[in-house]
Amino acid sequence: MRKIISLIHLSLDGFAAGPNDELDWIAYDEELEQDAHALHALTDAVIWGRRTYEGMASYWLTVPGNPASTPAELAHARWLDDATKIVVSRTLERIDWNDAHNTVLIKENIAEEINKIKQQPGKDIWFLGSTMLAQTFMQLDLIDEYRININPTVLGRGKPLFAGVTREIPLKLLESKTFKSGVVALRYEPNRT
């Protein structure tokens, strides 16, 4: 069965974004970029919420035509174009990503629909949703691997990752590593025993 792998950056005080969705505090460098791009080999699909999808589409669809795009950006844009894009939204009517042949819109029955997708052949699925969607997926026990990058920054306020989670989620540490930037990468799986 395919796994859902969540990659989320957190501030030291537990925020996944600033109060206005700012992400400029992430200590993103070449080393973190390479770590994120390693997920390309493991995954062939991505899950987004509506707002994340809209932001990704507005940026990544322009990358191939932008002469200032870096090789890493071009590689990620190609991966996104080839990947199945799964968008969870009650308000979207359709997904417009190039020819949209590899898109799935989930409007209801999230757990049932995601579990159907996990049963289909393919590589693992990269979860890049918002904090609200992440909390929903955590509540429904849909995330199979948590990759949490703790950044050496205290935001003081913002969008907390775990605020809407009301159940205990025991985790087993699979790996931890420290990057030169001071980011500590933690990789967990739910301890479902």
For each predicted feature, which ranges?
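Portal/gating segments that form or line small-molecule/metal binding sites
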Residues: 1-142, 152-193
